[in-house]
Structure formats: structure tokens, C-alpha cells
């Protein structure tokens, strides 16, 4: 899904909450923008003490030191070392919420003793069964976190999932089940989210279409806006974020648009 952690999944991705039904299509998924020689030249050196290099999280270009066993991890952190995966801590009541905030832990990948004798379909089913708090396809409670960051952390360290493609595929799957009738949705953020996905789905059909920056409304589970909104960047740059009113999505007057955390709670503390 092209998150976006600060440089790209940055947000991402979508992670682990939504299981998408495969949608047959001749179109190609959008991937991260290629890393130019200029961008690579700006990368800081990796410490010589680093035991294992890892691809950058999200759409970044600079190699990073892979996270070791037991290290804190999440959507916007470095990737974990080979043989590990990022999981919410045992007993965590909101696994997805914790992982999107870097509150997971690097643990050994669950063993699959009989994997060699399984078909590809059975392997995928076994993999999906390890996803905590999976949201069934019939669920209409899909936020930006679930759409954008699913399939990011739960993928093995060797996989590179096209995040935006998964978000659009999820949307198409819902439309196929006649579950995303925008006219019936009253919540403002949810309505805008599906309108944006509809536009992206249409743009994806155009041959040669390249989109490296876009905006997906960040909705809460009730269909209203999170006060912090960010663009999604697939070109390795830090995402721009800003603050909005949760009930309308309108920009808060005087709030800044910055690359990083705009600390939106400060505006509500002042007003209250």
C-alpha cells in the first residue's frame, strides 16, 4: 500500500486488520517512487556495528539497521530482522492501534511445521489466521489505518506489498458486495474516504498513471475525522500533516501544516 512512516507509510498501510478478497485485474499496482542517485547520496551511513541491514520502512530510500528481537516496532519504524515479525503485545486490547503507534514488539515468526506440504492457498489461509483482530470483509468499520496499513507489518521482512493497491482492492471488493453505497453513508469522513478511493480506483485504470502523493481521509471508527490528517507520500519524502475539526474535517484556523506531528491536541486544549 504505497504509509507511509514519516517517509512513506508513513504512513502506511495499511498491517493486519483487513483481509482483502483478490480482485482480478489487468492493471498494475502502484509502487513506491524509484530512488534517484541524488536521494541515495543523501543517505546517512549505517553504523558498522549494525548486524543486519534492512530496506527502509515505507517508501524511504535509505537502508536502515534491522530491528533486533525484542525491539519496539510499528508502522513507522525500521523493519525487523530476518525471521522476526512485528506483533502487538499479548493482551493488548487494541492491536492495530498499538502497532500504528510503534508499540509492538519484534518476535520470532510463528513456526509453520507443515508449510512445505501445504498448497499456496492453504499457506495464505494459515498466514491470515495469525493476524490479530482481523476485520471480516463484511465489516463496514474500515478506517484509513485499516485500509492503508493492512498488509504492511504482517508481511514477512522479504516481501514488499503495494499498499495503495491493497486499499483499492479492498474498496473494489466492498463495491462488489454492494457494501460501499456512498449515498447511504451519513458520516462525513467515511463518505469522503470512499469518494477518494473511487477516484483513485478510476485513476489506476489509466495506462501509465503514476501517483506518488495522495490524500486519504483519516477516519475514526465512528466515521468522523481524526484531528490529525496527513498526505500519503510514495516518493520517500516526509508526509505533510495538519489539524482539522473531527466533526467536519475543516482545517483548524491558525494550525500549521508541517512534516511531522502537528500536535493537534493543543488546539482543543486551548478552546476548551
UniProtKB/Swiss-Prot annotation:
InterPro entries associated with the record: Growth_fac_rcpt_cys_sf, IGFBP-like, IGFBP1, IGFBP_1-6_chordata, Insulin_GF-bd_Cys-rich_CS, Thyroglobulin_1, Thyroglobulin_1_sf
Chief localization: secreted
Domain IGFBP N-terminal: 28-109
Keyword Phosphoprotein included in the entry's annotation: yes
Chain ranges for the short sequence motif Cell attachment site as given in the UniProt record: 259-261
Cellular component GO terms, alphabetical: extracellular space
Name assigned to this protein: Insulin-like growth factor-binding protein 1
Organism of origin: Ictidomys tridecemlineatus (Thirteen-lined ground squirrel)
Amino acid at each position: 500500500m504505497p504509509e507511509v512512516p514519516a517517509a512513506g507509510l508513513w504512513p502506511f498501510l495499511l498491517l493486519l486488520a483487513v483481509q482483502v478478497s483478490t480482485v482480478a485485474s489487468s492493471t498494475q499496482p502502484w509502487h513506491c517512487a524509484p530512488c534517484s542517485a541524488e536521494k541515495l547520496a543523501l543517505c546517512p551511513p549505517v553504523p558498522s556495528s549494525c548486524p543486519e541491514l534492512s530496506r527502509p520502512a515505507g517508501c524511504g530510500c535509505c537502508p536502515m539497521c534491522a530491528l533486533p528481537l525484542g525491539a519496539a516496532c510499528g508502522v513507522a519504524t525500521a523493519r525487523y530482522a530476518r525471521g522476526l515479525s512485528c506483533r502487538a503485545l499479548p493482551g493488548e486490547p487494541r492491536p492495530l492501534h498499538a502497532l500504528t503507534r510503534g508499540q509492538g514488539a519484534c518476535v520470532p515468526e510463528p513456526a509453520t511445521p507443515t508449510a512445505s506440504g501445504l498448497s499456496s492457498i492453504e499457506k495464505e489461509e494459515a498466514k491470515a489466521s495469525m493476524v490479530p483482530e482481523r476485520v471480516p470483509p463484511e465489516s463496514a468499520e474500515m478506517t484509513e489505518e485499516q485500509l492503508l496499513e493492512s498488509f504492511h507489518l504482517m508481511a514477512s521482512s522479504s516481501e514488499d506489498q503495494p499498499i495503495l493497491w491493497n486499499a483499492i482492492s479492498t474498496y473494489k471488493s466492498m463495491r462488489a458486495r454492494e457494501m460501499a453505497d456512498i449515498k447511504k453513508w451519513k458520516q462525513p469522513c467515511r463518505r469522503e474516504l470512499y469518494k477518494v478511493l473511487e477516484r483513485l480506483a478510476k485513476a489506476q485504470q489509466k495506462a501509465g498513471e503514476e501517483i506518488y502523493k495522495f490524500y486519504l481521509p483519516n477516519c475514526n471508527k465512528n466515521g468522523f475525522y481524526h484531528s490529525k490528517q496527513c498526505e500519503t507520500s510514495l516518493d520517500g519524502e516526509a508526509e505533510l500533516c495538519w489539524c482539522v475539526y473531527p466533526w467536519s474535517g475543516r482545517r483548524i484556523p491558525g494550525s500549521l501544516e508541517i512534516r511531522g506531528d502537528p500536535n493537534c491536541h493543543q488546539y482543543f486544549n486551548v478552546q476548551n
